[in-house]
Amino acid sequence: MKYIAILFLVLVVIGCENDKKSNQKVIGQQAENQTDPQKQLEEEFGEYNEEVKPDDLEYYKAYNTALKLWKTPFHELNVKTSFGKAHIIVSGPKNGEPLVLLHGMNASSTMWYPNIKALSQNHRVYAIDNLLEPGKSQIEGEVKDMMEMMSWYNEIFDQLKLEKFTLIGASKGGWLAIYIALQQKARIKNIVLLSPAQTFMWINPGSEMLANLTYTLAPKRKRLHGVMETMSVDVDKIENSYIEQYSIATQKATFSKFILQMTPYSDNELNSLTMPVLLLIGDNDIINNEKSIEKAKELLPHSETGMIKNAGHFLSIDQSEVVNKRILQFLSLNQESSPH
């Protein structure tokens, strides 16, 4: 079974030049030396690094349109790292307890639109676009292994001065949240897992998974609605502007070798996580089921679990109000009096 799951995962994700001076005749006269346009921008605006490739224009437009769904103030932060630019959407009061959001595969940080207003009311929220997926983070060079990916996140946490914070991860972001917590146990205050993929159990191949696989191999826009019906109990509830952004993202996505490393965590690894952990899954979830809840209860020392009614894998959208309430209740119960 695990080899089938691995096979599924393999398939599912298929400088400025120096100043130049030229002598040109303009209407019979010598033209003045011209400054390189990029150099001018750098001198006028300081660090000018917001480069957008022509192929990304359509996606960026869709991303920005989806951001209009965020019914709360935000600003976009670009953090320079050794591996490229980290794009982070920041919301909430500056003195609020920090929350770091890790989105699902190819979903980008815009997926949090039904949750961000509630989560950022009293918390400082940092939604990070994954470096290896469609989004506004931009990779430079190569990320060789998961430890380098961890280094990328550590650079972000350090620059944001996040000493103690809560991780909230959805789907693939949930798996990643556990990975980060295993490397940074002292830094992670709480973990919230929203139907984490391949974290407690192997994904069971089936007809619904086959539909997702078929779409991934040939991501046609007309097929997307049917695929999303396997992930959501009410696709019509999902905002069209987000679906458009997600559609373009799935067409842009390339295979990541790190998918092969997304295997369920061992009993010892899960048992070593002593911070409070909240696990929520949908009752119509094709990624997780009651076995995930049972394993979380058995192995995580301080866990809280919940099965959300009338929700699929996209439970943060299907039942956003219920999910938001459960998350905030969990955070309130596990609030520390000490400053972060």
Regions found by a protein language model. Give the residues of each.
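Short beta-strand/loop motif that positions the catalytic acidic residue
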Residues: 273, 279-281
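Active-site loop/oxyanion-hole signature of alpha/beta-hydrolase fold enzymes
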Residues: 127-168
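Alpha/beta-hydrolase fold catalytic core
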Residues: 16-97, 163, 332-340
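Conserved alpha/beta-hydrolase catalytic His-Asp/Glu region
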Residues: 202-207, 216-272
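Acidic catalytic loop of the alpha/beta-hydrolase fold
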Residues: 284-288
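Conserved HGGG/HGGXW glycine-rich cap/lid loop of the alpha/beta-hydrolase fold
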Residues: 87-135
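Flexible "cap/lid" loop of the alpha/beta hydrolase fold
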Residues: 175-182, 190-218
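Catalytic histidine-centered segment of alpha/beta-hydrolase-like enzymes
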Residues: 311-324
